[in-house]
C-alpha cells in the first residue's frame, strides 16, 4: 500500500522501485517479487527460500514439516519460482553456517528461477558466513548491487 500511495502522490516512480533484504528480509524479498507487482527488481542476500530445508520450525512456526507440509510449502518462495519473473539478484556467503540459510538455499532458488525462464544472478562470496566481513567481498557485493539496480531499475 505504501508504494502505491507514494506513487499516486508523485513522490516515487513505482516502475523504478526495488526491494532488498538480508536473511529473513531476503526471504521476504523473494516472496514480494513472486506475489506482487510493486517492484522492478529485487536483491536478496543470504536468505532461506525453501522452508522444507528447515523442517523443524522457523520464525513462530513450531510444527515440523511433517506436521504441516502445506505451511512450509506455502511460505517458501522456492514453491513459486515459476512466478518469479522480475529480476532477482541472489548474493550469499559460500561458507554460510547459519542452519536455516546454508548456501544451498540460494543455489537452488537460482536454478529454479532460471529453469522457469526468470531473470536471476547468483553471486557467491568466498569464505563468507551469514554476515559478510572481508573488505573485498563487501566492495564486490556493493558493486554487484549497484550494477543490478543500474540495469533493472535506473534504466527503466
Where on the chain are the PLM-derived regions?
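Active-site-proximal cap/loop segments of hydrolase catalytic domains
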Residues: 1-156
Amino acid at each position: 500500500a505504501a508504494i502505491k500511495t507514494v506513487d499516486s502522490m508523485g513522490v516515487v516512480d513505482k516502475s523504478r522501485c526495488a526491494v532488498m533484504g538480508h536473511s529473513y528480509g531476503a526471504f521476504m524479498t523473494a516472496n514480494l517479487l513472486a506475489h506482487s507487482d510493486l517492484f522492478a527488481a529485487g536483491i536478496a542476500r543470504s536468505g532461506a527460500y525453501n522452508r522444507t530445508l528447515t523442517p523443524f520450525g522457523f520464525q513462530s512456526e513450531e510444527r515440523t514439516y511433517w506436521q504441516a507440509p502445506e505451511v512450509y510449502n506455502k511460505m517458501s518462495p522456492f514453491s513459486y519460482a515459476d512466478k518469479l519473473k522480475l529480476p532477482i539478484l541472489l548474493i550469499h556467503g559460500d561458507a554460510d553456517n547459519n542452519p536455516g540459510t546454508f548456501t544451498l538455499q540460494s543455489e537452488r532458488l537460482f536454478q529454479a528461477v532460471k529453469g522457469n525462464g526468470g531473470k536471476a544472478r547468483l553471486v557467491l562470496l568466498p569464505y563468507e558466513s551469514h554476515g559478510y566481513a572481508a573488505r573485498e567481498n563487501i566492495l564486490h557485493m556493493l558493486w554487484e548491487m549497484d550494477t543490478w539496480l543500474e540495469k533493472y531499475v535506473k534504466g527503466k
